[in-house]
């Protein structure tokens, strides 16, 4: 493994016990690739957002012992300097269109997030911040980024919802990555289920479902972003 001389190599060294490469194990390309992926994931969850598996190289020596390979892992030379820098979360900006795409835009600030929205936009007060696990100032984590995207997508109230970070060509020496979330509300489908529970001949309780009228879980008819 690389000598722990800087942030990224110290991080790699700290998890050698979790390595997928073991002395005496069979030498194969799949194991080498899996270890690259493990380290890249570790790095990207600890601020090194631009680190990639291909930035890790192996030097193999087969001359020391018969039928054995001595491996040395190194960080590839000439990779972008941004890949070796740990970032924190910067600003989180949200832009939401209403379901019609028409209306006046307004802006609110809520829990360290800036939200521009198109009126009328009816959502619960906590819907966005409670589903975004990234927070300004914390070490940037790709897992938290993916979790935020998944949480928002699973709400089922957006026609689309996209999460992007500062492009690599726009960093200009910055220590943080800004997050931009863009979305549009979907046209609400109004429905509810009426449950008719009845006893079956086999003594088990079975439901009879009747498709009916209106039910909102995340949308409120009279709560707008102005109420947040």
Give the role of each language-model region.
Residues 1-199:
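Periplasmic polypeptide-binding modules associated with outer-membrane biogenesis and secretion
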Residues 193-197, 207-211, 220:
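Transmembrane beta-barrel strands of outer-membrane/channel proteins
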Residues 228:
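Cytosolic catalytic cores of cyclic-nucleotide second-messenger enzymes
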């Amino acid at each position: 493994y690389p000598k722990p001389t800087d942030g990224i190599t110290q991080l790699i060294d700290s998890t050698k016990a979790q390595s997928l490469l073991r002395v005496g194990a069979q030498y194969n390309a799949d194991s080498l690739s899996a270890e690259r992926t493990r380290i890249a994931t570790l790095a990207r969850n600890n601020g090194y957002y631009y680190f990639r598996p291909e930035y890790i190289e192996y030097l193999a020596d087969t001359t020391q012992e018969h039928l054995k390979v001595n491996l040395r892992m190194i960080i590839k030379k000439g990779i972008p300097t941004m890949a070796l820098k740990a970032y924190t979360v910067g600003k989180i900006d949200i832009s939401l269109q209403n379901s019609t795409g028409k209306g006046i835009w307004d802006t609110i600030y809520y829990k360290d997030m800036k939200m521009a929205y198109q009126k009328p936009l009816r959502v619960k007060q906590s819907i966005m911040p409670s589903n975004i696990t990234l927070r300004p100032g914390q070490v940037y984590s790709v897992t938290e980024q993916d979790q935020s995207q998944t949480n928002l997508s699973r709400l089922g109230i957006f026609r689309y919802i996209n999460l992007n970070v500062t492009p690599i060509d726009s960093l200009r020496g910055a220590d943080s990555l800004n997050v931009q979330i863009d979305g549009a509300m979907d046209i609400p489908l109004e429905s509810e289920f009426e449950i008719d529970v009845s006893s079956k001949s086999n003594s088990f309780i079975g439901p009879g479902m009747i498709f009916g009228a209106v039910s909102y879980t995340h949308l409120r008819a009279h709560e707008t972003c102005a109420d947040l």
